[in-house]
Amino acid sequence: MEYIVRYCPKCQGELHIPDSLSECICLYCGENVSFRVADSLDTRSENELTAEYDKAISELGLLFQGHERIIPQFTNGTYAKSFQEYLKAGERVLRPIEQYAAFSGKDEEVVERVTRELLSLLGQEINNTKTTLGGPTKGRIIEEYRLFLTVYMIPMIRYLKLPFSEALADAIINGWCREHPKFQFSKGSYEDLSSGFKQKLCFITTAVCRAMDKADDCYELNAFRSFRDEYLSSTEHGKALIEEYYRIAPAIVAYLNLCTEYQLRYRQLWSDYLLPCLQAIEDGRYTDCERFYTHMVCVLKEELLI
């Protein structure tokens, strides 16, 4: 049985209910809550629904407002809470749009308008952000928005399970990829992203070796594991580095796997960091390996703003 999040219209309490349930009793205020959109629309005029729809369209910018504050929460231990908070904001904007679509039967038109307006707003944000000497480049700014779309906005739209959720997610991704062909990404879900934090196989070394068609017990991975367990774990600094790596590695892999150029990125990680690290291990130069390892973690943290 799948569960979805809804909010009580009286107290705004967060309710986790089966996706097939049409009504329930609010656990917080005792209100009898109905989720049957069609029923709720019967008592509202077309003018009211249209006005609320237009207002929601004008508020689409709220879907990426504060993205620079939210992105650093995409880590093990903080993603779930930050996503649920973002979900509330997303539902407040998208629910009136869903109701208008249900009333008018114009799902395709609604998806087209939302996509057009949203991408236009994103374009304005990107173009209006001033780049300064030593500050973020335009490419860096686009990368930030791609990251936010990939791990927050698109998963939020899909999580709500609106009648047009999948169509809207596809339209936004397709439109973004047309406008930014060097910054493409694939459709992900909150469930898949959050489960990635619980899997040991999502670490960077494993992901890179898998991209190179190497087995989970290959020579390279065993060498990295031995370095971790026998050298890094022997010092407090090394233990702290391992802990930081475990905090961010699942997020990095989850994001890279949804970027269309992930194979290239993994090859770059191998050639720039992991291969030199492996060669240092083989030569007994463990401090050099630690240096490569530390630099890789710092670079990836900066890339994902975490």
Where are each of the predicted segments found?
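Cys/His-coordinated zinc-binding microdomains
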Residues: Q12, G30, F203-T206
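Short functional micro-motifs and their immediate structural scaffolds
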Residues: H16, S34, A207
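Short Cys/His-rich Zn2+-coordinating modules
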Residues: R6-E14, K182-K187
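Short linker/helix segments within small regulatory modules
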Residues: I17-I25
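Long, compositionally biased charged/polar accessory segments in the mid-to-C-terminal portions
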Residues: D42-I306
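Short Cys/His-rich micro-motifs in 6-15 aa windows
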Residues: C29-D39
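Short cysteine-rich clusters marking metal-coordination/redox-active sites
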Residues: C8-C11, C24-C29
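Residues immediately within or flanking Cys/His clusters that coordinate Zn2+
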Residues: V5, E23, Q199
